[in-house]
């Protein structure tokens, strides 16, 4: 019970801090009205982009947003087979993965993480990604220690779409929150974000790659760069990632060449600096990267695009939304 009390106090402190932050921002600057995406329009982009705001998934095409789900805890959509979407639905004490149509209709529930025994036995699933052949989907999930249920370190799992059998791919470092952002490779390997903790109890993030399930893998970036949230171009020759480089005030969008055969990565180059960048995603032709970032320091997250080859100017697609920064845009053709 002690950890429950401590957790409650921590949440209360966090809520208080967020309230103070927003109150201070209200008096320091003009109060910004956050619109629902379907209340605004934007420039026309090729293809279709899915984004998330306030627990609802929106489809952006031909310069307009359409809400396809209710505001009911939906987050982190990913493209699935036959144009479908696999989406996380987060509830108070667990989350599950669902298969949705492009209009938001439920086609199936892929995980069942709510326990009938106790809240401590519930599980979380996040960051779904299908393999290029759509035969397997990867996701991050926790397997709680029954004697230490407060330990929630996510590992990456692969679930066979036909058999429904899941196998654990990665072994997370304890007390870091675990592994995240799986990106399956055509050759059968896996890119993801791995977190570690040093002797000063500081958590570091690195882009990590594994050739096969259960292997130790290797780091593609140093812990000093603080890189996370990898995204691959459709031809799997470019990696986009977010790197903090030790800063708590900014996160840069970096891009590097990648050889999916040798698993070698080139030196990262900065595409976007001076912003709090999050959740990059490539366009279907690989020429453009969509990402999320505030339009001004402390602001809400907006949708941006930038050319993947650089140097190029970032383009703001929205100005007054409040997009979910943990839900990467899903950019598909059509």
Question: Which stretches of residues belong to each language-model region?
Answer:
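Sequence signature of WD/YWTD-type beta-propeller architectures
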Residues: 2-334
């Amino acid at each position: 019970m002690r950890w429950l009390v401590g957790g409650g106090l921590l949440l209360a402190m966090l809520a208080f801090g967020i309230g103070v932050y927003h109150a201070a921002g209200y008096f320091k600057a003009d109060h910004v009205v956050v619109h629902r995406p379907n209340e605004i329009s934007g420039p026309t982009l090729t293809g279709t982009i899915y984004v998330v705001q306030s627990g609802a998934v929106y489809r952006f095409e031909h310069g307009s947003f359409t809400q396809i789900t209710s505001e009911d805890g939906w987050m982190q959509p990913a493209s699935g087979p036959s144009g479908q979407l696999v989406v996380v639905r987060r509830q108070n004490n667990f989350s599950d993965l669902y298969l949705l149509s492009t209009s938001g209709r439920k086609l199936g529930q892929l995980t069942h993480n709510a326990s009938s025994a106790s809240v401590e036995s519930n599980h979380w699933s996040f960051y779904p990604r299908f393999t290029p052949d759509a035969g397997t989907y990867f996701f991050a999930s926790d397997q709680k220690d029954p004697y230490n249920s407060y330990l929630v370190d996510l590992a990456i799992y692969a679930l066979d779409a036909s058999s429904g059998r899941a196998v654990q791919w990665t072994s997370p470092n304890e007390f870091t929150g675990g592994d995240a952002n799986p990106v399956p490779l055509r050759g059968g390997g896996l890119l993801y974000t791995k977190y570690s903790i040093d002797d000063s109890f500081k958590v570091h993030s690195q882009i990590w790659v594994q050739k096969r399930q259960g292997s130790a893998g290797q780091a593609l970036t140093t812990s000093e760069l603080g890189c996370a949230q990898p995204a691959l171009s459709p031809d799997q020759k470019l990696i986009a990632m977010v790197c903090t480089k030790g800063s708590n005030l900014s996160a840069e969008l970096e891009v590097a060449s990648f050889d999916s055969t040798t698993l070698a990565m080139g030196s990262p180059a900065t595409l976007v600096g001076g912003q709090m960048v999050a959740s990059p995603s490539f366009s279907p032709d690989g020429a453009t990267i969509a990402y999320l970032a505030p339009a001004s320091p402390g602001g809400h997250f907006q949708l941006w695009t930038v050319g993947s080859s650089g140097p190029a100017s970032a383009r703001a697609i929205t100005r007054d939304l409040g997009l979910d920064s943990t839900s990467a845009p899903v950019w598909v053709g059509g």
